[in-house]
Amino acid sequence: MTIKNVIFSLFILAILAETVFSQNCMDTSCPGLKECCSRWGFCGTKDEYCGFFCFSGPCNIKGKSYGYDYNVDAGPRGKIETVITSALFDSIMSKVESNCSAKGFYTYEAFITAFKSFGAYKGKVAKREIAAILAHFSYGSKSFCYKEEISNERYCSKSKKYPCEPGKNYYGRGLLQSITWNEYYGAGKHLGLPLLKDPDLVSRSPEVAFKFAMWFWNRNVRPALYLGFGEITKRVDGRECGNWRRDDTKNKVKQYIEFCEMLGVTPDQGLDC
């Protein structure tokens, strides 16, 4: 092989490596400090990367909504304990049926403690976001009726980083029961909790249940708030989008609108996914 061919081959490999990197930027981030990762997983510095559809990086989304009010992080704000008071929380939980296994499990104290354990919620929070969180938590637990998935599958993958504990199952527990598999229970590493060794801790402790769900929300959902309720629904459980589970999507949107009305705010316009 000539030197010219070697140089050409290295050039092609560099391009391929850059392409592969950019296509996975939602997992690996972009190589350049000035680059943005788009919601489709590509890196760049132009408006299609850093504008309205920016996922991470130095996003510039102000004025990029193209006339639509999509931002779930917009509108009236307040501290979590003033937006959701003890009386309002009790009113929501009073609708839980007496035959529900989680009746009385989800408490106001656990709710507030879990929220305030994340820096983003120690100050004022958009009421829309709180409404969206409640809608997803309510839907994910069947209106706060359950604290664990009815179908108790094992959901164990061969992960060296988050190995399964012998005899333990990693099915959905808590408020977002679409969160399954041992990798997600690896959240215990970030929460300071032994969730891989003791996944049932999520269904034993209301505070842990809220923290587990809030960890997922902060990590996977919150970066997309400006894209609308439909987009964050896709990030919680993409199976609900499209034509496969339209009734599920409609019911979740209905709950979001109801919680928005309860908090005195208008929902965003990006409801569908």
Curated annotation (Swiss-Prot):
GO MF terms held by the record: chitin binding; chitinase activity
Cystines in this chain: C25-C37, C30-C43, C36-C50, C54-C59
Coiled coil: none
InterPro entries in the record: Chitin-bd_1 (IPR001002), Chitin-binding_1_CS (IPR018371), Endochitinase-like_sf (IPR036861), Glyco_hydro_19 (IPR016283), Glyco_hydro_19_cat (IPR000726), Lysozyme-like_dom_sf (IPR023346)
Segment forming the signal sequence: 1-22
Glycosylation sites: N99
Domain spans labelled Chitin-binding type-1: 23-61
Region of interest: Catalytic: 78-273
Keywords: Chitin-binding, Disulfide bond, Glycoprotein, Plant defense, Signal
One of the GO BP terms on file: carbohydrate metabolic process
Family label: Belongs to the glycosyl hydrolase 19 family. Chitinase class I subfamily.
Protein name in UniProt: Inactive endochitinase At2g43600
Lineage of origin: Eukaryota, Viridiplantae, Streptophyta, Embryophyta, Tracheophyta
